[in-house]
Amino acid sequence: MIIVTTDTIANQNIVEVKGLVTSSIVQSRNIGKDILSGLKSVIGGELKNYTQMLEDSKKAVRERLVNQAEELGANAIVGLRFELSAGQGTSELIGYGTAVVIG
């Protein structure tokens, strides 16, 4: 499955648009890790626990998008976008794109 953030794929023709694919994941944050991350944010530096949580979320959302696209009979996703929102103790990652057939 080819996945791109652009609306076209270089050297490929989109022969059919199958439709929108969307997925989201909501995760709660760990209080213990929040305390350690709070200290780290005061000192400065990467919040590795949150970075890993975000990477895991992106992977899960991508897998779900691929499954949806395959169910529609697509072999590619164009225009992939991610949106992240954080709330009180949670974060939500939404991914969406257009499932297409390239040939």
From Swiss-Prot:
What top-level branch of life does the organism fall under? Bacteria
Q: One Pfam match, by short name?
A: YbjQ_1
Record-linked InterPro entries: UPF0145_dom_sf, UPF0145_YbjQ-like
Report the HAMAP family cross-referenced here.
UPF0145 (MF_00338)
**UniProt xrefs under PANTHER family:** UPF0145 PROTEIN SCO3412, UPF0145 PROTEIN YBJQ
Q: Which family does it belong to?
A: Belongs to the UPF0145 family.
What this protein is called in its record is UPF0145 protein BLi01945/BL05168
Name its species.
Bacillus licheniformis (strain ATCC 14580 / DSM 13 / JCM 2505 / CCUG 7422 / NBRC 12200 / NCIMB 9375 / NCTC 10341 / NRRL NRS-1264 / Gibson 46)
